[in-house]
Amino acid sequence: MLKVRTDLDVEFLAFELYELEVTEPREDFELEIARATQAVRAGTFGDIGRARALYRRFGTDPTRTRPSNEALLRRLKKGNALPRVNSLVDVANALSVQLQVPVGLYDLEKARGDELTIRLGTEGEGYSGIGKEHVNVGGRLCVADSVGPCGNPSADSARTMITTETERAAWIYFLPVTDDDIDRTAELVAVFGRGLVRMA
């Protein structure tokens, strides 16, 4: 079973997703995309300040390195659509926008070891990002496995990215969410990721 630990003063929620059947983007997810878009138009999304405060607490300027939730929010505010990647990543992006909480997703068959750690990156640490050449995490909040960092609240790594081959994954909310949000996460993962969810 997945274990996620930290020695930092951060509140997070982690889930292990298993028996997944990730597919290409699904047409029947358009309702959730519309819900996220409507939340932005109506201003009913979560508190954008929570993720910014998390970054500032660890010395990162959130106006220069934006949390993923805010980057997605800004995309929608500019009239652009949410990126469609696959059935599981699409769920994470939609919930991240609505809740305004950064979400990390990691393929556990690609991660090394039985444990993920939320920590500060050391000087010079980084990884190849998804669609990015290099992501520097030195001095920044990151997620690491036994060989090094594989994600952070702004951008995950290509090494542990979710694909249609993913059968087991870690889902991390980098801020607390409500019990209703947890239930909704499990529901959407079951419907669109065709998988099961347990707390890590």
Question: Which residues fall in each region the model found?
Answer:
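Charge-biased, low-complexity intrinsically disordered regions
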Residues: 1-200
